[in-house]
Amino acid sequence: GDEEHGDEEHGDEEHSDEEHSEEEEGPVTIRLRTERTEAEVAGSNPLPGFEQFKVRFVDTSYKHTEFEGDEVGTVFESDSTNTRVELKHNSWGAWQGVFGFQYTDLDFSAVGAEAFIPNTNTKTTAAFWIERGDFDAWQIDLGLRYEDVKIKVPNTLVLEEGPTGPSSDSDFQPFSASAGTIWTISDAVGLTGSVSYAERAPGVEELYANGPHIATQVFEVGDVSLSKESTVHVEGGARLDLGRFSGSATVYMDQFSDYIYQSDSGLEEEGLPVLVWSQQNADFVGAEVELRYDFEESKFGHWQVFSFADVVDGELSDNTDVPLMPPKRVALGLDWDKGNWTANVLWIHAYDQNNVAELETDTPGYDLLNAELALNGSGQDQFEWQIYLKGQNLLDESIRNSTSYLKDQAPQIGLNIIFGVRVFF
């Protein structure tokens, strides 16, 4: 897929490079453009033993320009082509599945004072197999994927102008395998379980970053010696469906080898904290619970009340906490519809996040209240429209996102009301 760099909201943050300290700069803004072209061809009985084929081609062009006041700062461009071929084989008894091939060619470039990643070309070739077997009360899912990832960097120096640095090539062969099952004990009760092994090649940013990343207000330093990241994922769950009442619960564990993450070095460069891409083993454990009650429809409309909770904890092999972990959350919501009208209210309570990495600050908890009211309509030829009024952060809380390095500089947006129209055709 595309690599999008720096498209987060910037607000009115001031650029703080020391080399420009003598001149006052305007607010940082961005202008972005994305063009996407898709084509798909499908047919039947392409080869003996296969009942269906599908070929999908996607071409995506992405460009965004960062402005400092009225002056162009840095231009990021990403052009990618993705070709995916799928062959669905004839049924093997209770088994149905797909063999596939995928090829992606991605060119990325950044030009300007804020470029922090060198120009790169990434070619990814992959073969995969997905299979599903249905055996009365049991459903079994299997999957395999093999990739070859080649990254070419003509010039590893990240400079607006000046000398040319050495080129660099990286080559990785990630492999993944998974197996999962769903056991339908009855119409009301089901159990799920899965285990997977997955490898991931380090990304361009993780390998080659070296400069100020204005979108996150940090100075990023990559590590070209990073190796593949791998994880063993084990998950178990249960679902309950008693008609109007339903619920589900999931627990999971991830055991990473050579987990890739950013750590705060404690140093500063150009007035920004230096974050270094590193890797070491890590373990994650987490759980999620969802509950819903569907009230009988009445003259007052159709009401549903729901709640969810989630928690995850991550620890590195040196017994320190994984940086930027999300907080524990509990939530309560209400959905309503009557005729062409729909509405919803959602309250989320996030607890304090005190399990933080070295040099990372604690993040206070918060209460987030959102609501939306919408009128829906339709016309001819699948034309649909929606007029909506949406309120976000209705309690006007100061919300800090523990998963962002910007949390100490930029809280999330306060109380805001949005009126809009959506059109679908």
What are these regions (language model features)?
Residues 43-49, 89-93, 132-137, 183-187, ...:
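Outer-membrane beta-barrel strand-turn architecture
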Residues 97, 246-256, 273-353:
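Gram-negative outer-membrane beta-barrel transporters
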Residues 27, 40, 56, 64-72, ...:
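Outer-membrane beta-barrel translocator domains and adjoining extracellular loop/strand segments
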